[in-house]
């Protein structure tokens, strides 16, 4: 069968569950499933037919969900289930899932794997696109490895291991475990007290949040995406104003009336690696050397307030690209022409090289290869060991567990609990991520 469009793929029995769900938030489950497949003389007839078929699919594949629920009232785990139902309703025999656990709690991920095993047992083919080696080893029968757009290896999962797969993905041996000494926390560098943030639509996204980050430690914030972590980070870094509470950094106090923008926060000793490198971290149409000074272009070493010292900027960019292994190491190359991993290393190079007192890092390894992940993790730990305070926000629970000294868990804009990393239990964190407090668990 020749496939030239999504319609051709669906007709050939191929279904796709995208990393970012393709659902209409204000429609019900039933309306989302029937959308685009309407048959018969009336919409009501189509809905009745779809409802009967959905009830059968739910029973056959243990995909229970309230078909009359509106999508935006469902947790992400159930929204993903709706995407699977949509694909099965359209007759999918081959189901492709792209990074399916990126937005799930550990408990939701386990439930997804049970569903995928059920699909396999009933004769469906499941293709999992993921960079999470633990998941590959846990659920797959066969694994193929792509590197730089080429298929470089095929293995039976039972005949390989995480170390070999990582080496195949990167082209060299990769250190799988983060090696770090115990933290030696010093005085508080960042103190957040009773912080509230209300967005432009009047929704309270951050609710009475308080915590500290000390010099020489990494504090990780865990949580399913969309629970206020992004807004908290943007408030702390001066991108968004807040309505209540206070932030103290390097002895400076910021309140809802005594405000500080992102440039002021940088002067206070804060560096920020934003979670969306292309929207917040880079101007992709600019060259590498122009991006390497973004936000720091008024630095006297770059700028004598009459003109920019281009030669110095280019030489400085070359050194930083070499130190942070940015490839290709061409300071004149446009940022859009670098791979995602090298774009991220460009942002990391710019922020880490400023010798900040406080480093705020959002999703540091999103969309980067395992080799770049290893490198960025080493750099974060080196900053901690140099006595810097690090606030790490990530939806990757493995990353939070391996890098953090203390872990805060956010749900619905609130801090649900604090756990020492050495005592952390993945199941307990998963419950907190789902809004279940420890005493209620």
Where are these regions (language model features)?
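Glycine-rich phosphate-binding loops of nucleotide-dependent enzymes
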Residues: 1-441
């Amino acid at each position: 069968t020749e496939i030239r469009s999504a319609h051709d793929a669906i007709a050939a029995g191929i279904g796709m569950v995208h990393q970012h769900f393709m659902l209409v938030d204000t429609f019900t489950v039933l309306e989302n499933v029937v959308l685009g497949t309407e048959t018969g003389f009336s919409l009501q007839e189509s809905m009745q037919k779809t409802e009967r078929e959905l009830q059968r699919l739910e029973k056959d594949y243990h995909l229970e969900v309230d078909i009359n629920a509106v999508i935006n009232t469902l947790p992400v785990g159930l929204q993903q289930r709706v995407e699977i139902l949509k694909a099965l309703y359209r007759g999918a025999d081959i189901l492709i899932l792209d990074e399916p656990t990126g937005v799930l709690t550990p408990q939701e991920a386990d439930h997804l794997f049970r569903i995928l095993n059920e699909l396999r047992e009933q004769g469906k083919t499941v293709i999992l696109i993921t960079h999470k080696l633990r998941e590959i080893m846990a659920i797959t029968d066969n694994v193929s490895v792509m590197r730089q757009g080429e298929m470089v290896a095929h293995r039976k999962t039972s005949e390989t291991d995480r170390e070999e797969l990582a080496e195949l993905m990167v082209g060299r041996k990769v250190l799988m475990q983060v090696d770090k000494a115990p933290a030696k926390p010093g005085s508080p560098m960042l103190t957040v007290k009773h912080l509230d943030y209300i967005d432009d639509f009047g929704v309270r996204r951050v609710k009475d949040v308080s915590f500290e980050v000390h010099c020489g430690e990494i504090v990780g914030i865990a949580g399913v995406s969309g629970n206020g972590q992004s807004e908290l980070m943007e408030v702390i870094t001066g991108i968004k104003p807040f309505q209540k509470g206070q932030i103290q950094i390097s002895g400076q106090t910021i309140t809802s009336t005594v405000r500080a923008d992102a440039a002021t926060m940088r002067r206070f000793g804060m560096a920020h690696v934003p979670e969306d490198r292309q929207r917040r971290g880079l101007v992709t149409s600019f060259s590498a050397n122009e991006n390497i000074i973004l936000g720091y272009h008024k630095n006297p070493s770059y700028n004598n307030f009459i003109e920019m010292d281009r030669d110095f900027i280019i030489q400085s960019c070359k050194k930083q690209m070499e130190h942070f292994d940015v490839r290709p190491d061409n300071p004149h190359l446009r940022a859009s022409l670098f791979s995602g991993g090298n774009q991220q290393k460009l942002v990391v190079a710019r922020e880490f090289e400023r010798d900040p007192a406080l480093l705020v890092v959002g999703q540091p390894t999103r969309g980067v290869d395992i080799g770049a992940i290893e490198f960025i993790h080493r750099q974060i730990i080196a900053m901690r060991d140099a006595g810097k305070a690090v606030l790490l926000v990530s939806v990757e629970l493995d990353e939070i567990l391996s890098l953090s000294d203390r872990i805060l868990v956010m749900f619905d804009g609130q801090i649900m609990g604090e756990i020492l990393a050495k005592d952390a239990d993945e199941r307990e964190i998963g419950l907190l991520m789902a809004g279940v407090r420890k005493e209620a668990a």
